[in-house]
UniProtKB/Swiss-Prot annotation:
It catalyses: (R)-pantothenate + ATP = (R)-4'-phosphopantothenate + ADP + H(+). Keywords: ATP-binding, Coenzyme A biosynthesis, Cytoplasm, Kinase, Nucleotide-binding, Transferase. InterPro entries: P-loop_NTPase (IPR027417), PanK (IPR004566), PRK/URK (IPR006083). The lineage of its organism: Bacteria, Pseudomonadati, Pseudomonadota, Alphaproteobacteria, Hyphomicrobiales. It holds the Pfam family PRK. The gene is coaA. It is an enzyme of class 2 (transferase). One of its GO terms (cellular component) is cytoplasm. This is Pantothenate kinase. It comes from Afipia carboxidovorans (strain ATCC 49405 / DSM 1227 / KCTC 32145 / OM5) (Oligotropha carboxidovorans). GO terms for molecular function: ATP binding; pantothenate kinase activity. Pathway: Cofactor biosynthesis; coenzyme A biosynthesis; CoA from (R)-pantothenate: step 1/5. Its EC number is 2.7.1.33. Belongs to the prokaryotic pantothenate kinase family.
């Protein structure tokens, strides 16, 4: 019979309590002000100086080692091959469920990494911009699958990442509006040779079926040098989603331009019932079928408790 100690020996991750992880900050300086941190967290997410000090500064320090090692390897390979390739951006993926706080993590990392010395250029995109338009999804009968892998323009996203990794200039990505719940026509953002690119999205760690003929099939995560999965229990995620829905009912949904404006007048009870219906019909299914199964593919897992605070950190062994 295999013992717990033996199983731990074969665990691909080293797991740290919050207290253990916080000590790994060492002497990494705090480069963010309290008012900056306050602006970074998403609706109802929790972020304060203590969270940055104990979770994100150690992660920033770790990433500095990874990025430096990647640059040294790139230079060594360039000398070995006797080529003069452009410097390739270091790409970090941030994955996790709806309402888990991916955007908060991505923004904090962008701010911290941009203040390394020397000042690297750090850009951030979300994969929301690569969703198919609502018109396309409606024609394809996929509106209830929005956020599922099949709702994305995967070809466009892979082309974007390939161009970024190749060091091309002025690479453009579509823009998504959370107000209208749709792609913004004729609007793009420009990514111009960043030193580091952070890519945030639900399914960025997902793979697909490999073809029987053995032909190479690229996945989004093939372009990542490091990846972070933000984790929380399913029951916790459900409560966060419902709470966010009620908050949006009182704020963004009140805008007549909002796709969800029809929910602005719902009572608390009716709004919660609608939120749970959407969660159970769409987000929970996507979590179980597509998002959660990608967790073991992450380089680092941040496990949050019900108070939005990271309780445990797991780092994949080299």
């Amino acid at each position: 019979m295999t013992t717990g100690a033996e199983l731990q020996k074969y665990d691909p991750y080293r797991t740290f309590t919050r207290e253990q992880w916080a000590k790994l900050r060492d002497d990494t300086p705090m480069t963010l002000r309290a008012e900056e941190i306050e602006r970074m967290h998403s609706m109802l997410d929790r972020l304060d100086i203590k969270e940055v000090e104990e979770i994100y500064l150690p992660l920033s320090r770790l990433l500095s080692f990874y990025v430096s090692a990647a640059r040294r390897l790139f230079e060594s390979e360039r000398r070995f091959l006797r080529i003069r390739d452009r410097k390739m951006p270091y790409i970090i993926g941030v994955a996790g469920s709806v309402a888990v706080g991916k955007s908060t993590t991505a923004r904090v990392l962008q701010a911290l990494l941009a203040r390394w010395s020397p000042k690297p250029k750090v850009d951030l995109i979300t994969t929301d911009g690569f969703l198919h338009s609502n018109a396309y999804l409606e024609r394809a009968g996929l509106m209830d699958k929005k956020g599922f892998p099949e709702s994305y323009n995967l070809g466009a996203l892979l082309t974007f990442l390939s161009d970024i990794k190749a060091g091309r200039r002025d690479v453009r990505a579509p823009v998504y509006s959370h107000l209208t719940y749709d792609i913004v026509p004729n609007e793009t953002i420009e990514i111009d040779q960043p030193d580091i690119l952070i890519v945030e999205g639900l399914n960025v760690l997902q793979t697909g079926r490999l073809p029987a003929d053995g032909k190479a099939v690229p996945f989004i995560s093939d372009f990542f040098d490091f990846s972070v999965y933000i984790d929380a229990d399913e029951s916790t995620l459900q409560e966060w989603y419902a709470a966010r829905f009620l908050k949006l009912r009182d704020t963004a949904f009140s805008d007549p331009r909002s796709y969800f404006h029809r929910y602005a007048g719902l009572s608390d009870e009716a709004a919660r019932e609608k939120a749970l219906s959407i969660w159970n019909k769409i987000n929970r299914v996507n979590l179980r079928e597509n998002v959660l199964p990608t967790r073991p593919r992450a380089t680092l897992i941040l496990k949050k408790g019900s108070d939005h605070v990271v309780e445990r950190v797991s780092l994949r062994r080299l």
